[in-house]
Amino acid sequence: MLYFFLLYVKKKYILDRYEKEKKVIAYYVNNNERIMEQSNKALHEKYEFCNIRRDEIEQAVKIEAICFPPNEACTYEHMVPRIENAPDLFLVAVDRKTGKMAAFLNGLATNREHLTDDFFTNADLHDPAGANIMLLGLDVLPEHQQQGLARELMEQYKEREQVKGRKKLILTCLPDKVEMYKKFGFKDHGIGDSVWGGEAWNEMDIVLE
């Protein structure tokens, strides 16, 4: 069955999402014509953006192990309950040519205001009605980098959660990634409470307006 709905996300554009078999494809609509910036159009032609499926857990764990060192990467033990508790907060990009996952962005909902290390290991902290999202990982395989995939995942995530009424997205990152997230619209609040993996992490957030 095909579901159709329109979401006003920009003054000029309407986001026209079609959901089929839990897969989401996005187009921008203006004056009843489907349009999309060329960069986005190219990405959507190459990748399918959708919520993760249960049978993709192994892929997600392997990608996490490639993108993060062992002291930081989410293990299978913690990835499974994260996906089971909040599959709608696990956005993936699937390479249309290979059918394999190329990247993902995931998180948990909560009313808490700061990202602490327990979110990385305890998916039961997820509150479906939570006002904020703790982003727990943005992973892009090396061979799929340098084409705007991380930015596109983040933009789609922001739009999805804003429509749901979320207030903020919150993340932690190492200092060398702060500038990248600033370009995505996040505000840096300096070193936060997290010491995940024995590291000092900057806490950043973005208000969804």
Segments (PLM) and residue ranges:
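Helix-loop element at the rim of GNAT/NAT acetyltransferase active sites that forms part
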Residues: 62-75, 82
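Conserved GNAT acetyl-CoA-binding A-motif
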Residues: 154, 161-173
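Conserved acyl-donor/pantetheine-binding loop and adjacent beta-alpha core of acyl/acetyltransferases
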Residues: 98-138, 145, 155, 195-200
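A short beta-loop-alpha structural element at the N-terminal edge
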Residues: 46-60
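Conserved catalytic-core motifs of GNAT/GCN5-like acyltransferases
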Residues: 109-112, 170-172, 182, 187-203
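Polybasic, lysine-rich low-complexity intrinsically disordered segments
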Residues: 4, 11-13, 20-23
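Cytosolic beta-strand hydrophobic patch enriched in CBS
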Residues: 90-95
